[in-house]
Amino acid sequence: MLHTGGSDAPVTTGNYIDGVARPADGGRTYALFNPARPDELVGHAALSSVSDVDAAVRAAHGAFAAWSRTSYAERAAKLNEVAEYLESGQDDVDQRARLFCREHGKPIKETHLEVLRLGERFRMTAAYADRLARDEIEHGPPFDTIITRQPRGVAMLIVPWNWPLSILGAKLPQALMAGNT
């Protein structure tokens, strides 16, 4: 949940759990300030509680059975939809980059690149669908190896503050492509 009143207006973010944008349990938030300009309020983010995390994990467990049974082609199609959304509209990309610049105090060039690369990571992962579609990969002599792929369950991703979109892009699309939630 992201509410903006303009490109540099303060934003309010919440949780997105089980397909629904919602505030943190109890409605608690914390203020985000621009580290490069400590008096500039960037916005407010949800101060999630244990019950919010539990709700997210329950939702992910609930979605796992259906998602893990989808084909690699179906997963790739969804990842490409996400990439298209992330890359759509130069104005949206620029606005996201400005927001991350203000939130992290990073140069705009870095945040712009990070926003664009997130979509690329989803698209690159989706491109592997055909290679992953085989249930087993057997290597012949001199190797006695069989690789099988099975979704494991819920993936919890914690990303650092300094490159949040880059780290997310290096973990989330792959977990989803593997059939995890």
Which sequence ranges carry the predicted segments?
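Conserved strand-loop elements at the edges of beta-sheets that form or border functional pockets
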Residues: N34, L47, R149
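Secondary-structure boundary/capping motif
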Residues: A24, E110, P164-I167
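A short local loop/turn or secondary-structure capping micro-motif enriched for an aromatic residue
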Residues: A31-L32, S49-V53, L165
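Residue-level signature of catalytic and energy-coupling elements of molecular machines
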Residues: G19, R75, F122, A155, ...
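Glycine-rich loop-to-alpha-helix module at the N-terminal edge of alpha/beta enzyme cores
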Residues: P38-A133
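Conserved small-residue-rich beta-alpha loop and adjacent elements
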Residues: D135-T181
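Hydrophobic face of amphipathic alpha-helices that form TPR/SEL1-like repeat modules
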Residues: M1-R37
